[in-house]
Swiss-Prot record:
Protein name from the UniProt record: Putative protein YmfH
Bias (Basic and acidic residues): 10-20
Disordered: annotated span: 1-34
Top-level lineage group: Bacteria
Source species: Escherichia coli (strain K12)
Keyword Transmembrane in annotation: yes
Length: 103
């Protein structure tokens, strides 16, 4: 059976243990919810670009009233824009992670 003095000693020993830091030396943890907002903004941008491009290409299809051929590039252009935007945002995020959070 554990008495009160032993429980107090165990609690004091647990409080004196160093905290575990999962970040490498010199790297500061990201502040509160700022990182989540940054990632949500990037996700919105990455999803909005292809949708906007598809809308523009769709309106071009309806206004021209002509048959679409695979050589028009109307399907591949939004995908290319989305991939390029996603790659650019990932590159910018990597740079800001190295330099410290600016958002």
């Amino acid at each position: 059976m554990v008495n009160a003095a032993q429980r107090t000693r165990v609690k004091v020993e647990a409080d004196n243990r160093p905290s575990v830091d999962t970040h490498p030396p010199g790297v500061q943890p990201s502040p509160g919810t700022g990182g989540t907002r940054h990632h949500n903004f990037m996700l919105c941008v990455v999803l909005a670009v292809p949708v906007f491009s598809l809308v523009l290409s769709g309106t071009a299809l309806f206004t021209k009233q002509r048959r679409v051929s695979p050589d028009d590039g109307l399907i591949t252009r939004p995908i290319l824009i989305a991939v390029a935007t996603g790659a650019l945002l990932c590159f910018v995020e990597k740079l800001t992670d190295r330099a410290g959070s600016i958002c």
